[in-house]
Amino acid sequence: VFAIIMLPLFMIDGLLRMTDIIQMPARFCDESLLKRYLAYVFWRFSKVATLKVALWTAKRYIFKRCYGFYKLFNKVHNNRITFISLRRDDISGNFAFVYDKLKNVDGLDINFILNDHTIADMSFKEIRSFTKACATSKVVVLDEFTPQIHYIDLRPQTKLIQLWHACGAFKTFGFTRLSKPKGSPQTTRNHRNYDYVTVSSTYCKKCHSEGFGIATDNVVATGIPRTDVFFDDAYKKQAQEKFYKEHPNFKGKKIVLFAPTFRGMVKETAFYPTEMFDLETVCQKLPEDYVFIVKHHPFVNDVQPIPKKYKDRIIDLSEDSELNDLLFVTDVIITDYSSLVFEASLLDIPMVFYVFDLEKYINERDFYFDFKLYAPGKIVYSLEQLISAISTNDFCTERIKPFADMFFDYRDGKSTERVVKLICDNLK
């Protein structure tokens, strides 16, 4: 990627050397002008590209050897737990709820590694910290696909627990996507070394077992820790008060949360086709008491600006606010293939599924169930249909309860307790 970014500079450099402003290396002087120029640019490009590959290979080698060193000369500490997340740079989400309980347990040594650095991006200090933590922890907890953990062979004494960030089982992932674009190859080590994966219901066990290439017995229906707040009236009231204090003009209005997922296969290429959701048109067509919260997926960086004339009706909280907290003030959700639908179903929030690219998404990504049959809300394919559904309160709300029943075994606010018990049981 770096070499591609540098390509325009290499081209300019080549032009300067063609005009003798800067001397052309002798090796290129026997060619015709065009061949000389192209050969020089390609040479510069390949040198940088090769250097990046060599650096990545070297760091991966150091990463593995560093882990081997700590594994050889350090013991596993039976009280040590390490949380690793590539999704967040603070203690939030499921980690926050689990940590809040664990910190009250005497004698635990709890560590966090919170950043999105790949092995190639890691400093040598970060490599040491990561590998030492993995080599000496009794339990390692993840909340996302973490490729670094699959480059090393964890000791049998170390238990790897995946608190998968999403509720339910919606979009296919992992080995379920073998035949799909960018799907995992059958030979990959990814995911297979999880000792336990926590899910929201018994129905999800088969999906996660298939997706991660692990035995069904390794998938445990504990519930999802961050959903416990939905059963905490005091927390709900606090979240509402906080939101209205920050956005007082939204109080008493009909709040619509626009929370789509990203398009693209990986974080680096993630996007949302903003031209398909024209904020100005939506505001024009719906009454003034409708206000909007825009909450794009964390992977999406290029989002549309808010029209000046509607700044009092639209706020973009893509980089702020915990998504769960926003649900406490939401009257209607506009989404597509986001796993947000699971949390929304717990709160019985009306939903509209704006899926203008459904067939393409099925071909490229697909679902664990028939989307048209099970989606817990109104399905629309155009902006006009979307506006009509909201205007007429046509949300197909009768589909919400069966959906929630399928994907949640527990609705008791005690999912965190069950996950904490699983972790502590593996410290013994």
Segments (PLM) and residue ranges:
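Catalytic binding pocket for nucleotide-activated donors in carbohydrate/polymer assembly enzymes
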Residues: 307, 337-407
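Helix N-cap/beta->alpha junction signal
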Residues: 144-146, 200-203, 296-298, 337, ...
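Conserved catalytic-core segment of nucleotide-activated headgroup transferases in glycan assembly
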Residues: 90-99, 225-306, 380
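A donor-sugar binding/catalytic signature common to diverse glycosyltransferases
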Residues: 140-164, 169, 321-365
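Donor nucleotide-activated moiety binding/catalytic core segment of transferases
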Residues: 125-139, 293, 298-342
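C-terminal amphipathic helix plus adjacent low-complexity
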Residues: 2, 10, 24, 235, ...
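Active-site and donor-binding regions of nucleotide-sugar-utilizing enzymes
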Residues: 80-234
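N-terminal pre-catalytic "stem/leader" segment of glycosyltransferase-like enzymes
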Residues: 2-135, 139
